[in-house]
Amino acid sequence: MNLFTSFTLLTLLILTTPIMMSHTGSHVNNKYQSYVKNIVFCAFITSLVPAMVYLHTNQETLISNWHWITIQTLKLTLSFKMDYFSLMFMPVALFITWSIMEFSMWYMHSDPYINQFFKYLLLFLITMLILVTANNLFQLFIGWEGVGIMSFLLIGWWFGRTDANTAALQAILYNRIGDIGLLASMAWFLSNMNTWDLEQIFMLNQNPLNFPLMGLVLAAAGKSAQFGLHPWLPSAMEGPTPVSALLHSSTMVVAGIFLLVRFYPLMENNKLIQTVTLCLGAITTLFTAICALTQNDIKKIIAFSTSSQLGLMMVTIGLNQPYLAFLHICTHAFFKAMLFLCSGSIIHNLNNEQDIRKMGGLFKALPFTTTALIIGCLALTGMPFLTGFYSKDPIIEAATSSYTNAWALLLTLIATSLTAVYSTRIIFFALLGQPRFPPSTTINENNPLLINPIKRLLVGSIFAGFILSNSIPPMTTPLMTMPLHLKLTALAMTTLGFIIAFEINLDTQNLKHKHPSNSFKFSTLLGYFPTIMHRLPPHLDLLMSQKLATSLLDLTWLETILPKTTALIQLKASTLTSNQQGLIKLYFLSFLITITLSMILFNYPE
């Protein structure tokens, strides 16, 4: 066992310590939250060792196998894959979880079950790391389902609220649709290749692989909230803000994109799958950016921005640039977690008020939080030399300089400019102008449990992109040369978005619409998607069930087939078998004929 394996397993072992100590009774202690936070910090420091060694030894991949079980011809192993993706993702996920857990100690301090909450967060992180380090599909599936069930428990944490329960069920049901795709792919690989080991699958690489790859795309669409399976992501905002921060930054929502990054050796020569992922990502990034434009819940706006960025990652997968997609996963995690923590600080200080129309003037009341929020919004838009710029700019450059679908490229560029629009809208409504909250509201951000995590993520949102982009192995993403006007495309689209936002703000300050426009309704009602998909199918199902119950069961079986048919059969039988039918005239006629014949016979002379 070498250094990579030992330190990776040590990281996972450190994280499982608070879980294993649950039965000792220490989890009821008031210091349990601080203990869990420190454990995650220790795991973060430990995970830095293999990451640094990997970057300085120029190794490609290291795989550790332990035989687990043999089922007929299938050999299952406990297999850990230490490559660029897993070794770089682990420190990022642990750093962000460490910050979120410290923030949770402030945000959830009055919750009676806060220790259980921390345990759930830790399990959420562990299952994500299992997924990231897995080298076979069975192990990956354990992590995949683990993040799914933990998201259900965390989104529905406030189980006394109906909306939270509905959102948790929605998340689990949409993810079950994606799980069908993953299970179908696993079944195909098992029946056709007799293996779930990733390296063997890549070596065999049969053609065509459209069916299993479409299953993987469906799985990624469910887990990473692509268009069609996206409504659960904004609904997940019903959970506590630390859950939203962890869910949307470095864990569950990027699991689908990470799955496709893992399987890129199978996808890189399959044009059909690349086109599907490109178009799906382009539609997602534009649709969710449009939906974010008119939302008034600050967490919903940030949630839709997450979905839009996931669409951009899917576009990058479609461009056959998995390393750029992974870079955007890591950089996006920093500023997205910080945006959620800043929104949580504002919501907590304003007594759980999430409507940006009831905020305003917070720049002076919460100077540190609002500064971090502005930098996070600028990083989200891809402002030069912030973290988002180092991943977003190369993605736009790769899209504009590749032989790709111009339609998908246009949608992506429009969505990029809209990112600047809704980011500016958050700044205008929440931070600037006159205060629109009650004057008696007590506002205080001077708490180290609040300031320190945001401060760490703020540093990450400024410098992490530079560090991560310089750590990409040079043999995977070659340097691109392009004309100056293409090089400036991403910056031009962001600038255009800012200009549009400022112009709209200036033009509509004193403008009142009697009736909302159709485009406003489309954006506010989320493209009518929840209305149609969450109401029409249940309505049709209930209507069909009612028709089946009344027409088929009640009228046909319980009325026509059983009672009426039985009565009719009995009537026919009694009619046929009865001697007396009540026909008086016929009886008299038969008597007459009988008497007449008798008289004729008796009176006939011999």
UniProtKB/Swiss-Prot annotation:
GO terms for biological process: electron transport coupled proton transport; mitochondrial electron transport, NADH to ubiquinone; mitochondrial respiratory chain complex I assembly. The keyword GTP-binding does not apply. Its EC number is 7.1.1.2. It is a multi-pass membrane protein. The chain crosses the membrane at residues 1-21, 35-55, 87-107, 114-134, 140-160, 171-191, 211-233, 241-261, 272-292, 301-320, 325-347, 366-386, 413-433, 457-477, 482-502, 582-602. It catalyses: a ubiquinone + NADH + 5 H(+)(in) = a ubiquinol + NAD(+) + 4 H(+)(out). GO terms for molecular function: NADH dehydrogenase (ubiquinone) activity. GO terms for cellular component: mitochondrial inner membrane. It is an enzyme of class 7 (translocase). It is found in: Mitochondrion inner membrane. The keyword Iron does not apply. Keywords: Electron transport, Membrane, Mitochondrion, Mitochondrion inner membrane, NAD, Respiratory chain, Translocase, Transmembrane, Transmembrane helix, Transport, Ubiquinone. Its main location: mitochondrion. PANTHER family: NADH-UBIQUINONE OXIDOREDUCTASE CHAIN 5. Core subunit of respiratory chain NADH dehydrogenase (Complex I) which is composed of 45 different subunits. Core subunit of the mitochondrial membrane respiratory chain NADH dehydrogenase (Complex I) which catalyzes electron transfer from NADH through the respiratory chain, using ubiquinone as an electron acceptor. Essential for the catalytic activity and assembly of complex I. Belongs to the complex I subunit 5 family. This is NADH-ubiquinone oxidoreductase chain 5. It comes from Balaenoptera physalus.
